[in-house]
């Protein structure tokens, strides 16, 4: 139970933690139908349909390192959602792209956000404000590239 005047209720990190955990739990209920984790979902949604993306760039988009991405991409490849190919010029450069099945699944996956939103007691305006504030917070405070 949430206690509004507790010490934790005033802590930004705790409120982010609870929100993230509970939102991901709601997504997970829908993602079971596709045999996907939330992390697999965000990786698929981060790849544009006709895009070839190297693992470093993909990691920057989703704030994951290659040690986390590599096993996840192998699982997504086994499910025929992505294909991993090496560049002829530089075999160290691993390119990720969506398969036809990966492209086909993106539309129903995008609808999950709407379903999750509809489970919350929040207006579209409030949701938009939260998204804009969080986007601003992330862009001002977290650098996910190697340009540090």
From Swiss-Prot:
Stimuli inducing this protein: Transcriptionally activated by CvfA.
DNA-binding region boundaries: 55-78
A Pfam family of this chain: Staph_reg_Sar_Rot
SUPFAM superfamilies per record: Winged helix' DNA-binding domain
Keywords for this protein: Activator, Cytoplasm, DNA-binding, Transcription, Transcription regulation, Virulence
The keyword Transcription is annotated on this UniProt entry: yes
Coiled coil: none
GO cellular component, one term: cytoplasm
Chain ranges of the HTH marR-type domain: 9-139
Localization per Swiss-Prot or TrEMBL: Cytoplasm
Principal subcellular localisation of the protein: cytoplasm
GO molecular function annotation: DNA binding; DNA-binding transcription factor activity
Task performed by this protein: Activates transcription of virulence factors alpha- and beta hemolysin genes (hla and hlb). Also, activates RNAIII expression, a central regulator transcribed from the agr locus.
Protein family per UniProt: Belongs to the SarZ family.
Protein name per its UniProtKB record: HTH-type transcriptional regulator SarZ
